[in-house]
Amino acid sequence: MKEEVICILCERNAEKAHIPDKVGYFIKCDICGEYFLASPEIFESSYTDLPREKRAMISSYTRDCFEHSKEPPQLEDAGYLSGIITEYENKSFDDKIKNLILFIRKKSPELGYNVLLEAQKDYPVTYSVDPGGFKEVLNNAVEQRLVRSIESGFELTEQGYALGTELMEKE
């Protein structure tokens, strides 16, 4: 049975489902993707007590797993994720742009395909703490002529589409 809850990472609405024979629950969030919180009575406060910037990096990690079709990560004590937090905090601006291009390319079956990007929802894709960071990465991709703004969204340029295809092949 699913119920509406607040995501412990981004503090937005999410769906919570209990899984039989497992201690914990599964979360599906539009921003963070999907994850399993093990032993919530023990570990939930270790996440909610983290600074928002640290939770945003865990959100980027869970969204990354979701976007790359990996199994939803199991979150336990937030301390065990300290290496992941550091890894995501240290992503270069180039890494952020490449992940945005890959994200758009996966949604583009062909060159010139219109993709709706929502900074409020998609900011973890650029390893950003908030929608402002997403907009900065997107604007830079536009300046580099990898992405172009069109009337109802964004599309990859030929150069962006080629880069996105190359990144998809490396996955």
For each of these PLM feature ranges, what is it?
Residues 13-16, 35-38, 147:
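Secreted/processed peptides and extracellular or luminal domains of membrane proteins
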Residues 6-15, 82-84:
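Short Cys/His-rich Zn2+-coordinating modules
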Residues 33-51, 56:
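Short metal-binding segments enriched for Cys and/or His
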Residues 7-11, 26-32:
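Short cysteine-rich clusters marking metal-coordination/redox-active sites
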Residues 53-128:
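Short amphipathic alpha-helical interface segments
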Residues 17-26:
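Short linker/helix segments within small regulatory modules
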Residues 126-143:
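Short amphipathic alpha-helical interaction segments
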Residues 38, 148-170:
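Accessory beta->alpha helical hairpin/"wing" motif in late/C-terminal subdomains of nucleic-acid enzymes
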